[in-house]
Amino acid sequence: MPWPKLEEVQRDAMIEESVEESIKDYGNTVLYSTARNEYMIVRIKQLIRRSVWALTRQMEKGDFEPSGYEMNFGSGKIDRVDTCEDEDVVYVKVTDYKTGMKSFDIVALYHGLQMQLPVYLNAALELEERRASGKTVEPAGIFYYRIKDPIVDREKDDHALEEKILKELRLDGMINAKEEVIEHLEHQLSGTSVLNPIGKNKDGSLNRYSKVLPPEAFAAMLSYTKKKEAQVKRQIYAGEVQANPYELNGSTGCDYCAYRDICGFDPRLDGYSYRSLEKYSKEEVIRRMEEEIENREEPS
């Protein structure tokens, strides 16, 4: 039985069993050696319960079902692939679990950063095409789920409290704006969703907060990702490993770099500066992607 269809007591029992098995792998004496470690185990279980609860709510509202977990491709691993069959079409989306606050940025993708999610979706689409038995396979979306147990203010009733928690755990990413995809993703959507990065206006159109791309633009994003991925591979094979960190929206390639203490790059010294990347609107990024694909140019 798919986990979204399990009763809460069943899910809790499986979480308890899974965590205890993991503890045994590390050695009971280590993780239960101090009161602090024991408390950490309790917090881990709480965090997993909250995540499973939120992920279940997200799945319950739509027609997608998990088709694979921790799926390997090359040296990568996709946390979760979901599919939805609609007559002769199979829609595919991927979800990656994160402990930080990362949000998907299509401008960063254009510059060769944040390629993980679209690379994963391209791989998942190829896999599902081999399974589809002649059916058309189409992309539905790419998502980050942030693993956390948010603290929110109390509400007057349980439903309002649940909505507030779900809003804090809402998925981030990019969605194919095709009408069928939106309907399969979340039934009877009205207003701004607390589950997915989408919302509808009173006239039924998607609101300005929706993180969506028209089907043609979504396809262009995936095609561009393939070209950019090939370019990055060629650069690595050619030995292009110079310290040339970027700067975009106040973030730099050095912020979380494990080698920053030994690479020698220091922007405080003469001759060292970050590679400043251009900022574009979503529409401008898609236009540039489509032009580079059409002109068969090397991605910039």
Regions found by a protein language model. Give the residues of each.
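Structural signature of nuclease core domains in nucleic-acid processing machines
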Residues: M1-S300
